[in-house]
Amino acid sequence: MKVLVLFSVLFLTLFSYSSTEAMDEFDSDAEEDMLSLMANEQVRAKACTPRLHDCSHDRHSCCRGELFKDVCYCFYPEGEDKTEVCSCQQPKSHKYIEKVVDKARTVVG
């Protein structure tokens, strides 16, 4: 019986040691993978299109305002030319919300 208890304790010790080694190896691999993904994302990031500039090449490339991202609006100008013109603009509702938030910040401190 003593041998069985001793063998069980030895087995549990070795098992816990091997599982912690495997977890440490897994954690280091996960950290390396996360760092490589972040580096790839930074390389892949592109420059945003400023407000009131042409966004017809990429309609999702508008820059962020203070609180909200600008939206690419497309329209057809008056006249004989029927080409579509797109520009990054701030929606009026976002403009009003930003004004209210600015006023609240000045009042609160």
Curated annotation (Swiss-Prot):
One of its GO terms (cellular component) is extracellular region. It is found in: Secreted. Residues 89-108 are annotated as: Linear cationic cytotoxin domain. Keywords: Calcium channel impairing toxin, Disulfide bond, Ion channel impairing toxin, Knottin, Secreted, Signal, Toxin. Residues 1-22 form the signal peptide. InterPro entries: Spider_toxin_CSTX_knottin, Spider_toxin_CSTX_Knottin_CS. It holds the Pfam family Toxin_35. Residues 23-44 form a propeptide. Disulfide bonds join C48-C63, C55-C72, C62-C88, C74-C86. The keyword Secreted applies. The keyword Signal applies. Expressed by the venom gland. GO terms for molecular function: calcium channel regulator activity; toxin activity. PROSITE patterns: SPIDER_CSTX. Residues 45-88 are annotated as: Knottin domain. Enhances the high-affinity desensitization of human P2RX3 purinoceptors. The toxin is composed of 2 domains: a highly rigid N-terminal inhibitor cystine knot (knottin) domain and a rather flexible C-terminal linear cationic cytotoxin domain that forms amphiphilic alpha-helices. The presence of a 'disulfide through disulfide knot' structurally defines this protein as a knottin. Belongs to the neurotoxin 19 (CSTX) family. 05 (U4-Lctx) subfamily. This is U4-lycotoxin-Ls1d.
